[in-house]
């Protein structure tokens, strides 16, 4: 790695995506506060990563995301590979990129945090998955072997959706039941739209259904 790459953080300050104008945020259902990175911005911010030998960001992450690895892929413009890597450890990375408390977890543990500003890990994670989905990327299940087993998951909140994702990847058919007509649980009904746009949840439903997950909504069990 060249000296310029190693010390890129000196020339590239921490920057978040642009905060959207108030008029745009309040139009309709209170849109998300921040816009999205464009590819050059995401690559620039991802390139600030020092690729630490002992990545504290990864250790501090509750699911131990391969953060330096997918930051490197973003810097190189390999977004679809980055999306696949994100999903190896996290069934809902686009949600975590928006609502996870990065300041107390991965970004708080970033080596650059105290003196130079942490790498914008959450915003880059959001960029990866949103961009990959927009480009038509979907989880590759071509090597999954059906087991013939079928599991019912009660509740279409974050835990239920994550469980369904992992079961399908293991070759197990899944039907998810929920008393409400929409999936998401707390993400749908507890987190306001200015933090998590509900269209993001709708996209995740489309992805899960494409993986073979069946939703039975408006059904109360027990």
Report each predicted region and the residues it spans:
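Ferredoxin-type iron-sulfur electron-transfer modules and their immediate structural context
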Residues: 1-150
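Beta1-alpha1 glycine-rich phosphate/pyrophosphate-binding loop at the start
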Residues: 10-35, 64-76, 85-87, 114, ...
